[in-house]
Each structure stands twice: as C-alpha cells, then as structure tokens.
Amino acid sequence: MNSADTLSNLAALLLSGKVEVVDLSGRLGPDTPLLKLPPDFARDTPKIELHKISEYDSDGPFWAWNWLKVGEHSGTHFDAPHHWITGKDYADGYTDSIPVQNFVAPVNVIDCSAETAKNPDFLLDAAGVQAWEAKHGEIRKGEWVVMRTDWDSRVNDEAAYLNADATGPHSPGPTVDCIKYILSKGAIGWGTQCIGTDAGQAGGMEPPYPAHNLLHAANKYGLASLANLSKLPAKGAILIAAPLKIVSGTGSPIRAMALVPRG
C-alpha cells in the first residue's frame, strides 16, 4: 500500500466514524483561567477580551465579526522553544518558523488521574513513565507524551483550576528526571491538562520549571490546558496541535485535536 492509498483509507475511516476526531481544547473567552505570576516577578497576561465589531447592524448590516485580545499562552496553548530563555537561540523556535511536520504526531497518554485525585501535587517521575512503557509499549522518537490528570474538570472554576494558597499553586506535573527521560527517548514534546506544562511547585526544583527549562533547551514543545484526554487510548491516537503562525510568536492558543480509532 502506498501513501496515497493510506490517505484514502484514512479519509474513508473518518467519514465512516471508525476514526473519531476528539476535541482536546477548552473554550477561549473572558472567563478562561490564566496563569497568575508573583507580582514582584513579572507582569501577568491580561484577561482575554472579546469585542463585537458588528452583528447585522449599522456597523455591518450583512455580517457578524469580533476582534479578540488574547495572550499567546492563554487557554489550551502551544509553547514554542523561544518561550523560555533556554530555547531563545533557535532560529526555528518561533511559531512562524517551526516545521509544520512537527504539528502532527502520535501521542502517548499516561493516565495519572487516580493519583492526582488523591494528591494535587502528584509528580510523574521517570520510573512512572518506564512502568507505563512496560505495560503499553515504548515511547518512540517524534511522539508526544501527555499526562492525563482530568484537571480539565476544574476549568470552569478558576480558583480550583489554579489551586493556589499562601505557599503557591498546587497542581500535578513532571519531575526533572521525567522530562530528561522522555527527551532521551526522542519525544517531540510534553503536554498537560493544567495551566502550564510544569507542576505548581516546580519553581523549587533543580533546575526550576524543568518542562520549560529542559524541553525548550532541546528545541522541543509544550502543550498546556489540554482537555478530554480521558477519551484517548494510552497509545494509537494521532495528536494535531498547530499554533497560529504569529510572527516571532513564543506560543499560541490552539484547537488541539486527536484522531482516535473506534472500530
């Protein structure tokens, strides 16, 4: 079978419903939770604004459209290497210079939802990834690795989604050795269902924020605020995560989706 036959078969499977397209993005609007940074550290992304230009009225009698004010790292979004200082020198580290081939890849879904239901500060380590591989198969070069936590169930309550107290945010994520391990396997990137790709308490790790620090140092990518990972198999799905082609963009909101076999 050649590549043309393969694509033709995929089209038939999509039309028949034997391959399902699963939406992995949350809604994007004024109520979308956004990351809160320490006031003495950096400025926050402003809240998302949606403004009507016209809707079949005197400003536009036959059409409706809006303008949108939104930060690059808002809602379900893509982190490009230039987002972090360790990835600042890559010519192809921006949303308008990343090879488009990298936006479509197989995805490995590591289910940590039982652990995170009991412990919001749960950390996935390299041993946990290796145990998952022993059960489901190896992570291969060029594939995504995503951490299922079902944290998206909190997204309609910003306080619960950020889950912060006087000691900072409390949300699950990877350890340093987890990120080092998936990079050693050749993963193209790492994704989570939380506000960012790192755990809430990752600032205290060495190096701090390892998902950001190490992934982008290796010219790899991050996905945050993913939804519906419970609808994906551990292996076998194809992830599509294409950022807007923002000039010199460090990231972008995305409509992430997955192709999932159903029959």
Locate each region found by the language model:
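Active-/binding-site microenvironments in catalytic and ligand-binding cores
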Residues: 1-263
